[in-house]
A protein has these predicted regions:
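Extracellular LysM carbohydrate-binding repeats and other cell-envelope/extracellular binding modules
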Residues: 446-474
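Surface-exposed amphipathic alpha-helical segments
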Residues: 119, 302, 385-422
Length: 474
């Protein structure tokens, strides 16, 4: 959660004044007088702002530019230039805008284990650019919107319009999945022709699928239920990527992984949350700038987003935490009833104290959900917890109690001691094994699982003296 967001009224969109880097890593100058480049240029500041700004580290920028440069040399459109931006986000994501704007998050760089895996991601995004997928999708979206409006107007039926819109979304989803598969084909070809391991695409798709399972509160949940997703399911993409890679030779016998220079380039990379947005440490959220901290119950997962801190737990329990400026200095009981809570039960509003701070609570309900609303005043700000459980669940009060009981001010010494986590590349010494190395991991209660994940170590794998591995530490 951004400090800026809590010092003024929290909004659903985050638009800080962040300008493009004065010295970005550019493979080539963005082509002038290109309408596609103009479209990308318009969207670039918004993309950068929504992902926490640019990640500025000369060593890592040079690494990414080196990989992109090798791919550009074998591009289907050698006249196409690219601008590569590393986004300051722990999310694992990469995407492209028309005109050659490519984006990769530092979270993705932290998960990758060699240059060929990042090359697989970038070549896929370059495939979108060279195939003009962004322009094609925009045209298709405009056509589907027009078509659904025509159906609604001709038939004079809201139901018909909604049905037409739903069919349009399905057609767009299929179109997007087709684009993704086409970009995969282009990407694997570029990988092999650039001299990288062509099997890196399948390998990194495996890693991303494993990360998705790791982050899920329910690891057994079906990851393929979202049939409107713009990406085909991972199993399908992995199989197809391996099939296309075989054109270059057998797995393990072709291409360069670029592991050593890649690990050199990400050693010291910021991992997880940035200082401006606070830190997640296991079941605890801490924000030195705001001077506050709180815990979530066991088995909950915290997701620190720009606009708010979200937490999810078993049995569909969800928590949202954010803050607003205390501009009117009204009583907190009046604040709760001022209209921002839907389905509020006024009879449940009561004033309380939370670790010496003025606070108030209330209950609300809407559709299939019951809510606890807790607001706490501290230093001219109002912090807000919204806890949601399925209607009738007995977990509402225990969950809200944990949040309230643990919310407190940090001491100046506590705030000053907070440090960001980083990727640290270490060499395995004699006598060390996966368990001893995982014990050095910080910021997680699942040390062994996360160590295996970020190093792409399969079940039963071992390490040997001299191997280089990643750990997460301050």
């Amino acid at each position: 959660m951004a400090l800026n967001g809590c010092q003024s009224l929290i909004e659903q969109s985050y638009q800080p004044s962040i300008s493009p880097s004065s010295n970005p890593q550019i493979v080539d100058e963005v082509q002038k007088n290109d309408p596609r480049a103009a479209m990308g240029a318009r969207e670039h500041p918004r993309i950068v702002a929504s992902y926490g700004g640019e990640y500025k580290d000369a060593k890592t920028e040079r690494l990414v530019a080196r990989i992109a440069g090798a791919l550009t040399a074998v591009s289907e459109n050698p006249r196409q230039s690219y601008r590569i931006t590393i986004l300051n986000s722990p999310a694992i994501n990469a995407f492209a805008l028309p005109g050659g704007y490519l984006y990769v998050t530092r979270g993705l760089l932290a998960l990758a284990n060699d240059a060929s895996e990042v090359a697989a991601v970038l070549s896929h995004e370059m495939g979108h650019v060279t195939a003009n997928h962004g322009i094609e999708r925009q045209k298709r979206e405009e056509a589907e919107v027009i078509a659904s409006r025509v159906v609604a107007e001709v038939l004079s039926s809201d139901i018909a319009g909604k049905q037409a819109l739903a069919r349009g979304k399905l057609r767009l989803a299929a179109f997007s999945r087709q684009q993704e598969l086409q970009a995969d084909v282009i990407g694997v070809r570029m990988l092999g022709e650039a001299g990288y391991d062509p099997y890196a695409a399948a390998r990194f798709l495996d890693s991303m699928a494993a990360y998705s399972r790791f982050m899920s509160v329910d690891p057994e949940a079906d990851q393929s239920l979202d049939f409107l997703s713009s990406h085909p399911n991972s199993a399908q993409r992995i199989d197809l990527a391996r099939t296309h890679a075989r054109a270059f030779g057998q797995e393990g016998s072709v291409g360069d992984k670029g592991r050593d220079y890649y690990l050199d380039g990400i050693d010291g990379l910021l991992y997880g949350d940035s200082p401006e947005e606070g830190y997640v440490r296991g079941q605890t959220f801490l924000h030195g700038g705001l001077g506050i901290r709180f815990d979530v119950p066991p088995d909950f997962h915290i997701d620190n987003k720009v606009e708010a801190v979200m937490a999810t737990g078993p049995n569909d329990i969800a928590v949202r935490f954010d803050g607003v400026a205390d501009n009117q200095n009204q009583s907190l009981t009046n604040y709760i009833s001022s209209g921002w809570v839907t389905g509020l039960d006024p009879s449940t509003i009561q004033q309380i104290t939370v670790n010496g701070m003025e606070a108030a609570t209330a209950r609300a309900s809407a559709d299939r959900w019951d809510f606890d609303v807790t607001v706490i005043r501290n230093n001219a700000q109002i912090f807000r917890f919204l806890t949601a459980v399925p209607k009738g669940s007995d977990a509402l009060e225990p969950t809200a109690d944990v949040l309230r009981a643990s919310f407190r001010r940090m001491t100046p010494a506590e705030a000053a001691s907070l440090k960001p986590l980083r990727i640290r590349v270490v060499t395995v010494r004699p006598g060390e094994n996966i368990s001893t190395l995982a014990a050095r991991m910080m910021g997680t209660d699942r040390k062994l699982d996360l160590f295996k994940l970020i190093n792409a170590l399969p079940m039963g794998a071992a390490v040997s003296p001299g191997d280089r591995v990643k750990i997460i530490a301050e």
